[in-house]
Amino acid sequence: MGELPYKIQELKLRRIEELNNKLRNELARERMTASNACLSIIDYTSTHKDYAVPEVWGYPMVGENPYNNTMRKNNFARSHEETSACCTIM
């Protein structure tokens, strides 16, 4: 009868050790401060064209669609022609 409280204490200790290990792993993970994250976003948006922000990049030329991905359309058309099946699963 005296062994049951010992097993319960052992289980509690094991759970606490697992929690400590999880917390140590989380603490060891690389962190980024909010200011560095903001600078990273600003750097990305200032070097990659995004016509959704016309104040920075201006408007696209008339008749030009900068988001039109013709390469993807051509690959899809080619892959669709090569298959003889009725369906294509991507």
Curated annotation (Swiss-Prot):
Cystines in this chain: none
Domain of life of the organism encoding this protein: Eukaryota
Propeptide cleavage-removed residue intervals: 88-90
Cysteine methyl ester modification, residue list: C87
Membrane topology: Peripheral membrane protein
Lipid positions (S-palmitoyl cysteine): C86
A GO molecular function held by the record: G-protein beta-subunit binding
Lipid-bearing positions (S-farnesyl cysteine): C87
Primary location recorded for the protein, binned into one broad class: membrane
SMART domains recorded: G_gamma, GGL
Pfam families attached to this UniProt entry: G-gamma (PF00631)
InterPro entries named among the record's database cross-references: G-protein_gamma-like_dom (IPR015898), GGL_sf (IPR036284), Ste18_fungal (IPR041848)
GO cellular component annotations of the record: heterotrimeric G-protein complex
Cell compartment(s), UniProt: Membrane
Keyword terms of this UniProt record: Lipoprotein, Membrane, Methylation, Palmitate, Prenylation, Transducer
GO biological process: G protein-coupled receptor signaling pathway; pheromone-dependent signal transduction involved in conjugation with cellular fusion
Subunit details: G proteins are composed of 3 units, alpha, beta and gamma.
Xref: PANTHER family: GUANINE NUCLEOTIDE-BINDING PROTEIN SUBUNIT GAMMA
Family that this chain belongs to: Belongs to the G protein gamma family.
Name the record gives this protein: Guanine nucleotide-binding protein subunit gamma
Organism in which the protein naturally occurs: Kluyveromyces lactis (strain ATCC 8585 / CBS 2359 / DSM 70799 / NBRC 1267 / NRRL Y-1140 / WM37)
